[in-house]
């Protein structure tokens, strides 16, 4: 058997044994005409996941279960407590990094254990598209979003923009401003020479993975929606509520700039409306807020003036004055369509950091 995979299928899990089985059934059922590997990274599961994976590996080793072109099924464990996580996203990022570090394929895809695929040829179709477009770093499909417990036909295609032409080539501004999709719907050309562990560590989450690889080429679109994205009440996006939701979304693009400064101007342009919305909400509350301990703990670890301010629920009088000033500046930028992002970013983070970024890219 050829031990050099062309495709690495990467799965992360945490106490999802039964859902993992559904996920693996759909993955191992893929009809691929190239060698591929499946790698499962398990973060601290105590629900029998290890035993389930050992049994599945034995079935494959003993030829009780034969999967055409499968080179190996790897099961690896990690403990996200090791990275001193401040939120669920950092735990996921640590798990994603662990599974990514085991990948050997020319291409890779991510899939979460609580999701699955609804066709048996989607990965081959994406792979063919990337082989035909060597200039592209990723091939993007859409996802099919469905609520937990509901039939697939009750779901809907996401994102909800109008359908793109099949094989359309997208450039970074398209992805960041218009068509950004779930990371799991991308097949990505792996860049093994880049040390993602040292660059991102526990911050190697879905969005950072997408943005990192966007730096290496354009994106080709496949007009399919075969990744089933199941929505649960405990999903990360569902647990962010109230002022945490407002502030974290308001500062999201600043987080992206911290790790992917190549697209700093695009991020500021995209995030300006969320920054303005955040300041509007704060102004209505008299610049008082009540963030969860989790969010405050994460902000204390993040460099920059605005993060320091939100690390505590009680702001200093001079910080309130600056917050009001920054709000006026942001509104001014929006009203007159200004693009001197270096100044606004310097106000929000610090001038030294702003001066290190090439804002003309």
Segments from the language model and where they lie:
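Conserved donor NDP-sugar-binding/catalytic core segment of glycosyltransferases
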Residues: 121-155
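A conserved acidic beta->alpha catalytic loop
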Residues: 42-52, 80, 112
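Glycine-rich, basic loop-to-helix element that forms the pyrophosphate-binding segment
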Residues: 78-103, 113
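Short, acidic, metal-binding catalytic loop of nucleotide-sugar glycosyltransferases
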Residues: 25-35
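Short aromatic/hydrophobic "clamp" motif used to bind/position activated sugar donors
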Residues: 108
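Conserved nucleotide-sugar donor-binding catalytic segment
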Residues: 141, 160-244
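Catalytic core of nucleotide-sugar-dependent glycosyltransferases
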Residues: 174, 225, 229-233, 238-269, ...
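Conserved short acidic donor-positioning loop in nucleotide-sugar-dependent glycosyltransferases
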Residues: 15, 27, 43-44, 113
């Amino acid at each position: 058997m050829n031990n050099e995979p062309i495709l690495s299928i990467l799965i992360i899990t945490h106490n999802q044994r039964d859902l993992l089985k559904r996920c693996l059934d759909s993955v191992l059922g893929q009809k691929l005409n190239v060698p591929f590997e499946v790698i499962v990274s398990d973060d601290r599961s105590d629900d029998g996941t290890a035993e389930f994976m050992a049994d599945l590996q034995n079935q494959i080793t003993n030829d009780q279960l034969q999967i055409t072109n499968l080179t190996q099924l790897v099961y690896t464990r990690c403990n996200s407590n090791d990275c001193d996580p401040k939120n669920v996203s950092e735990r996921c990022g640590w798990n994603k990094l662990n599974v990514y570090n085991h990948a050997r394929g020319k291409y890779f895809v991510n899939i979460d254990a609580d999701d699955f695929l609804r066709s048996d040829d989607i990965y081959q179709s994406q792979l063919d598209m990337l082989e035909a477009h060597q200039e592209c770093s990723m091939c993007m499909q859409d996802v099919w979003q469905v609520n937990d417990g509901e039939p697939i036909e009750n779901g809907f295609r996401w994102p909800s923009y109008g359908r793109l032409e099949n094989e359309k080539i997208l450039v970074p501004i398209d992805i960041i401003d218009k068509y950004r999709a779930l990371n799991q719907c991308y097949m990505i050309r792996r860049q093994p020479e880049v040390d993602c562990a040292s660059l991102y560590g526990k911050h190697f989450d879905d969005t950072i993975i997408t943005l990192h690889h966007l730096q290496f080429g354009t994106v080709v679109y496949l007009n399919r929606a075969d990744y089933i994205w199941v929505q649960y009440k405990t999903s990360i996006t569902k647990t962010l509520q109230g002022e945490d939701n407002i502030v974290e979304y308001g500062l999201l693009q600043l987080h992206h700039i911290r790790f992917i400064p190549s697209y700093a101007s695009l991020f500021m342009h995209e995030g300006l409306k969320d920054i303005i919305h955040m300041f509007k909400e704060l102004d209505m509350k008299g610049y008082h807020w009540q963030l969860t301990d989790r969010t405050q703990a994460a902000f204390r670890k993040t460099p920059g003036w605005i993060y320091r301010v939100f690390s505590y629920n009680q702001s200093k009088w001079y910080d309130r004055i600056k917050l009001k000033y920054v709000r006026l500046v942001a509104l001014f930028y929006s009203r007159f369509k200004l693009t001197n992002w270096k100044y606004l970013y310097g106000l929000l983070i610090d001038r030294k950091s702003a001066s290190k970024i090439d804002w003309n890219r």
